[in-house]
Amino acid sequence: MTSHLSRADLSVAAPIVEFAEAALAESGRDIDEFWAGASAIIHELGPRNAELLAKRDELQKRIDDFHRENPGLPDKDAYRALLTEIGYLVPVPEKVSVTTENVDPEIASMSGPQLVVPLLNARFAINAANARWGSLYDALYGTDAIDQTGELAPGREFNYTRAAAVVERGRELLDQIAPLTEGSHRDATGYAVDGDGLIVRTEGGDRRLADPAGFAGYTGAADAPTAVLLVHHGLHAEIVIDRSGRIGTTDVAGVQDIVLESAITTILDLEDSVAAVDGDDKALGYRNWRGFMDGSISESVTKNGRTFTRVPNADRVYRTADGGELTLPGRAVLFIRNVGHLMRTPAVLDRNGEEVFEGILDAIMTSLGSLPELEGPNKGTNSRTGSMYIVKPKMHGPEEVAFAAELFGRAEQLLGLPARTMKIGIMDEERRTSANLKAAIAAASDRVVFINTGFLDRTGDEIHTSLHAGPFLPKALIKQQPFMKAYEDRNVSIGLECGLDGHAQIGKGMWAEPDLMHDMLEKKIAHPKSGASTAWVPSPTAGTLHALHYHQVDPMAVRATLTPTGEEALDALLVPPLAGEGDLTPEVVTQEIDNNVQSILGYVVRWIDQGIGVSKVPDIHDVGLMEDRATLRISSQLLANWLQHGVITEEQIDDSLRRLAVVVDEQNAGDPNYEKLAFADGDKPGIAYTAARRLIVEGAAQPSGYTEPLLHGLRREKKAEQASA
């Protein structure tokens, strides 16, 4: 067990002390003053945090009582009256004007993909930071974005026919983003630069760009550049020229690759994609964050028998046509996602020996970890405007947003940072925030840099809020219901109404099928078409492919065509997606039980046994799906809802758990660290299996349907078991 040390009137896990005091010493701040100030924040804001959680419980009780008395779809007027009476719906501010200052252009004015990655995994995090730039050729060749059958099938040997198809797609892109005055980039035999810009050599003569402003720079000699930099819709694309490369030697123009500016922002996550349950885990996350901020983070990687050190990429430097120099960031602008307001952590105990709120600790420690980038020798390497970007998840309504803003202000005072250095990204993923979004933005109108929708957590809260109204539809059908469209449309509309343009991102949710890139290219274009300036992707490769959508669609232009949502959208938002007569046939129910149980088991076993917070978990059909605590929340809440209404029984759940434990074990057979879920009759199930079952059968009792309270306790139990083995 991690030892604790006394600091002020706090008891602090030794790894947290070590992290904090090293950071304080380097920044020249007084250690005793810091701990005294941290204690003041914890003891003054902790009770307020608890009051906000108590209000959640009280509102939920009133809504539960209403649904018990009025089962089924509620009467619109009576339901609205209840929500207003109890303070669930608050008055809508007449006018909200976002005034956030010192925001980097990647957030304020550019559009492009966004990665989310667990901060406890340094290798993943470095890869995500470096996903600012990605090879289009690699992304196309290595995925199903290009047909993988017949003569295009990838194999052990390099497939030049497949490569030719990749090159053709690349030329299509160049013609789209940098059209010529005449002809096509397919006709190019070479590229050169002069004082007037880019020259495209062809057999029919030299050509110019139809829009000369599309040329941004080059590297190498002007008459034989090694790279040509283009810009389109605010995103850059680099034509890599190497006539000795495997592709370049076969390309008449010597084009070896096209490198796209891809994930312009990345969220390093301390929340849903990590398993951080104690002082050791929390300190690892804080150290990794500081490693990005001071430039020291690195990771040794072994690949194909070769070991090398992976570090964040350097900036990219180009020459311009007029002889000047252009420097572009080599890395994504980094957000850090703190946890929400719910959980306490044993990493720090207050003066009464009680665990402190984890979100308060995160605000203090992650801002401390940002000091080298905000004021030290590494200043400006993440934010060139002097800001720190924090995504704050799972907030319920404007009061909780205001509390987060106050907490950030206190952390700034503690560290002597300029007011409003710490910016806030508001996750619009809880129903009370969605219903009061304008007021929520108003509560942080001078800090907000991001609002974002997410189907999974939002649906998890939808189910839990209306748990007693009746049985919900299966997961796949919930997404198609009117409340979801209202949710997505209102997020963009209200964000624009509040003036987020030029100050903040409007974001959309995750593509959860990392192996299905063809489908992603077909479907995820809907996000920029909605007017959203960013959307989540599960991998650097997906980021590069999703970047294509922002060349096809300019979200900023889309916004000019949008019609504001009205009161009817709020009405639609408040209609729970309950199942109708005939929706829940025995076949549908059986399949949905197994689908959700499979998802829960496959995710929880890695979370509990190995501390892995995000996984590509094979579903019942062996399709790999990205799973994190948000997917766990919706799966467990749906089954809890069906149990509550007698659609299913505990016996059915137990039967599915026992059968699918065997399947999940088989799917993980290649993992040497895996511990089996299946157990013989009469034997005691393991902790992971127990966790999966409890999340379902106790789901109705979990606060807002969250999975963290059960997971954290059982993960600590597993860590203790492993330590004593």
Q: For each of these PLM feature ranges, what is it?
A:
Residues 1-70, 77-90:
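N-terminal-proximal low-complexity accessory segments that begin disordered
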Residues 2-10, 16, 359, 382, ...:
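Catalytic or ion-translocation cores adjacent to nucleophile or general acid/base/metal-coordination motifs
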Residues 6, 10, 49, 53, ...:
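Hydrophobic alpha-helical scaffolding
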Residues 11, 15, 19, 33, ...:
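Generic recognition of stable, solvent-exposed alpha-helical segments in well-folded globular domains
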Residues 15, 19, 23, 37, ...:
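Generic, well-ordered alpha-helical scaffold segments in large soluble proteins
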Residues 73, 273-281, 375-384, 417-421, ...:
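Flexible, glycine/charged-enriched surface loops at secondary-structure junctions
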